[in-house]
Amino acid sequence: MDNMNHEELNDQLIVRREKLHNLREQGIDPFGKRFERTNSTTDLVSLYGEFSKEELEEKEIAVSIAGRIMTKRGKGKAGFAHVQDLHGQVQIYVRKDAVGDDEYELFKTADLGDLVGIEGKVFKTNVGELSVKATGFTLLTKSLRPLPDKYHGLKDVEQRYRQRYLDLITSMESRETFVTRSKIIREMRRYLDDNGYLEVETPMMHAIAGGASARPFTTHHNALDMELYMRIAIELHLKRLIVGGLEKVYEIGRVFRNEGVSTRHNPEFTMIELYEAYADYKDIMKLTEDMVAHIAKKVLGTTTIQYGDYEINLEPEWTRLHMVDAIKQYSGADFWNPMSVEEARELAKEHNVEIKDTMEVGHIINEFFEQKVEDKLIQPTFIYGHPVEISPLAKKNDEDPRFTDRFELFIVAREHANAFTELNDPIDQKERFEAQLKEREQGNDEAHMMDDDYIEALEYGMPPTGGLGIGIDRLVMLLTNAPSIRDVLLFPAMRHKQD
């Protein structure tokens, strides 16, 4: 525990187990039974917070609440404690002459962290604090370990992630973050359902790792004796459903990528992918900004949010900027005129952009963007027109086939969404997959694998389609002002704890 040495901890463990033994000796179940609550702490505040001390005394409002003891004080025949539930804390006042000898003894010997139920009357103290005067006190669960020091909480950030249950007990901010996360996903579903989308479920284990450029996790199916991959994207199964006639589909689910851990990356994360027949990337741009603005309004009550030092305006319409124009604007390099690989490499050298020898012109354009532009994009910005070399599943632009009808959304210098007009030409798609295979042979283990079954599905005919993927964890980070992805994942990936 943070501010407690091993000797102190061991002493507390011994004392609490002695109390546990004493409770059982008295015939009291220290891990009790169902308790009927009439109100939460927020109910008490919203219903009775505006009443005066005198009004509450006159009304004698009876309530029953339950929660965890977070503070406790008093001696003799009366004492105070603060009891915490999901949304907050409320003070309780326990008098021996009101609850009786046995229940007062339970209160007196209760420890911080114990879960209790209280029946009583709502009142206000002389200083105006809304409280409950107990008429009944029930021990619901005996806590056998002491909570972290109430004044310091969990100082060790890693401990917060490893022992999220302690973080949730001691940090209201952390609890609110995860309540907000749930609301964000709920509003996302509601928006799509109201706009005619069908929620579906597709496999998490794939025979071929496809739909993104990433290293997969592998597993083995014993009964079928075959290697499988944990999905790195949801995309290709959803597009098969578009072929099948499900015209507007989405899935919210876990995706797995065998890559590094950082403040923005976790190997297991949550995505939403959606696809709409007869739409294109411009339609999806509008849907994206409208949906994110809707979520912000419903969950936060505003489209103006604070993230770190930045005030972000999520009200549509957002900036739209071609990747080549963005590079020219922020670095001066101009890729609009067609050029050879040698010319592109020379341009990279002039602008101190690091590249690999195997890169084609499109890869070099993307490196320019990542190294010279990305960290400048603070307000919501759609970057569109990605090179075909880095977009194996996107449709080529009709006016300039070097580029694709694809966009990525950047906010606070982070990618939050990836979308495109889907490539529905099976011949072109096969050629793109073959080009990706050559990249794999040259050492790019994130290049796309060949997927013959997907090609066959396209051969039956997929309508023009717009598709979108949003990393939900990053969206939650944005809307809760969280600096690290670990702050919005209940149980993030961690190294084994060293003894």
Swiss-Prot record:
- Give the matching Pfam families: tRNA-synt_2, tRNA_anti-codon
Q: Name one GO cellular component term.
A: cytoplasm
- EC number(s) per entry: 6.1.1.6
Q: Which domain of life is it from?
A: Bacteria
Major localization class:
cytoplasm
A biological process from GO: lysyl-tRNA aminoacylation
UniProt GO molecular function:
ATP binding; catalytic activity, acting on a protein; lysine-tRNA ligase activity; magnesium ion binding; transferase activity; tRNA binding
- For the keyword Heme, the answer is no
Q: Does the keyword Electron transport apply?
A: no
Tell me where in or outside the cell this protein is found.
Cytoplasm
Which top-level enzyme class is recorded in the Swiss-Prot or TrEMBL entry? ligase
* Needed cofactors: Mg(2+)
**Per its UniProt record, what InterPro entries does this chain match?**
Aa-tRNA-synt_II, aa-tRNA-synth_II, aa-tRNA-synth_II/BPL/LPL, Lys-tRNA-ligase_II, Lys-tRNA-ligase_II_bac/euk, Lys-tRNA-ligase_II_N, Lys-tRNA-synth_II_C, NA-bd_OB-fold
Q: Which NCBIfam families match?
A: lysS_bact, PRK00484.1
| Family that this chain belongs to | Belongs to the class-II aminoacyl-tRNA synthetase family.
Instruction: Provide the protein name.
Output: Lysine--tRNA ligase
Provide the species name.
Answer: Bacillus cereus (strain ATCC 14579 / DSM 31 / CCUG 7414 / JCM 2152 / NBRC 15305 / NCIMB 9373 / NCTC 2599 / NRRL B-3711)
What gene name is given for the protein in this entry? Answer: lysS
